[in-house]
Structures are given as C-alpha cells and as structure tokens.
Amino acid sequence: MKIIVLASTSPYRMQLMRQLGLPFHVAAPQYQEQIDQEIAPELLVKHQAAGKAKSLAQKYPDALIIGSDQVFVDASGRVLGKPDSLEGAVRQLRGMAGKSHTFYTGLSVYDSNRDETLTGFATYRVTLRALTEQEIRCYLQRENPLDCAGSFKVEGLGIALMQRLEGDDYTTLIGLPLIKLVDFLGHFGVRVLGDQA
C-alpha cells in the first residue's frame, strides 16, 4: 500500500484519521493559508486543501497526501477564520448567537507519483443558541477554542452552545470529511475495509 500522509498538524484531524485504522504519516504543509472574502467559500477551501496536499510532494514523491481546509461562514455570508484573541472570540460568538452558520471543509487527496488529484468539499450547518455574555465568557474560559474557526469546538464543550446541527457527515464539522475521504482513497485503490491495493 502506498504511504498515506496527512498534511496537517491539527490534533483533531489526526484523531479523525485514526478512526479509519490506516497507517499514516503526519507532516506540516508548506502552504500559507489566506482568507479572501471575494472568493466563494467552496472554491477557497478546495484551493487551499489542494495547496496543502501538493506542498508536500517533494518530501513525499510516492504517496497519497491528504490536505484539508475549513472556513466558517456566518449568517451574513462573511468568512470567519480562527479568532485573533480571546476578545476576538467573544465578538465572534456574540455575533453568531441565535443564528445559523455554515462550515465549508475542503478535501484533497494528491497522488504525488501520478500527479493526480481529487478535490471536493462538504458543508455542515450549525445553529447556535441565544447566548448571554456570561455564557460566552464561561465557555471560552473553560475550552479556550482559539485554534478553531468560529471560536468553538463542537466535539467538546462547544456542543452546549448548539441548538441544531445539520449535515451528512459530522466529521466535516471537525475538519476532515471522512465519508468523502473514504471515497477518495478508494479511487486510489485504498480500501478502508478489505484488501489494500
């Protein structure tokens, strides 16, 4: 089986990859992320996921390299990244409370030997409860989600902020859409269940 490389240092993505039971390497992508409000979010995350995967091609010339990127689009259509500070996180959550928002997660699997790429994206919609200032600050103090787009971790205490979650694959929300990844790996001959090609 070809070497599989996860182009990410995210502990959340690594944990999701472990669910598949496949051996894999982890490497930090050599790619500079940029949020551009003028680019449609689905195009942005696909472009950045592919950029992350391809950035490791020289280091791994015969591998399947997985890149993923996520942005959070608030109810007004504005793309939000990770908060810049605790106060930035307070502002994000204050503005999002009581509204529905969408996560866009891009996925790319790059076969560095064949120079072949599969790229796609998945979405997940979240509706936050109405939140008081005290609830927002209590949450941020207890979880400190400054490394997460949207300022919350739904896989942790952030679930208490939610009123509703909607989507086909909850792992999209965490940053690596596993249903789509299993399909992409299958295209390259990697069977999560069964014989490996």
From Swiss-Prot:
Catalysed reactions, semicolon-separated: N(7)-methyl-GTP + H2O = N(7)-methyl-GMP + diphosphate + H(+)
Pfam families: Maf (PF02545)
Entry's Gene Ontology BP terms: nucleotide metabolic process
Active site: 69 (proton acceptor)
GO molecular function (one): nucleoside triphosphate diphosphatase activity
Enzyme Commission numbers on file: 3.6.1.-
Gene3D superfamilies per UniProt: 3.90.950.10
Cofactors demanded by this protein: a divalent metal cation
Site (Important for substrate specificity): 12, 70, 155
First-listed, main subcellular location of the protein, grouped into a coarse class: cytoplasm
Keywords annotated in UniProt: Cytoplasm, Hydrolase, Nucleotide metabolism
Annotated compartments: Cytoplasm
Keyword Cytoplasm tagged: yes
A GO cellular component annotation in the UniProt record: cytoplasm
InterPro entries from the UniProt entry: ITPase-like_fam, Maf-like
UniProt record similarity statement: Belongs to the Maf family. YceF subfamily.
Role played: Nucleoside triphosphate pyrophosphatase that hydrolyzes 7-methyl-GTP (m(7)GTP). May have a dual role in cell division arrest and in preventing the incorporation of modified nucleotides into cellular nucleic acids.
Annotated PANTHER family: 7-METHYL-GTP PYROPHOSPHATASE, BIFUNCTIONAL DTTP/UTP PYROPHOSPHATASE/METHYLTRANSFERASE PROTEIN-RELATED
Name of the protein in question: 7-methyl-GTP pyrophosphatase
Organism: Syntrophotalea carbinolica (strain DSM 2380 / NBRC 103641 / GraBd1) (Pelobacter carbinolicus)
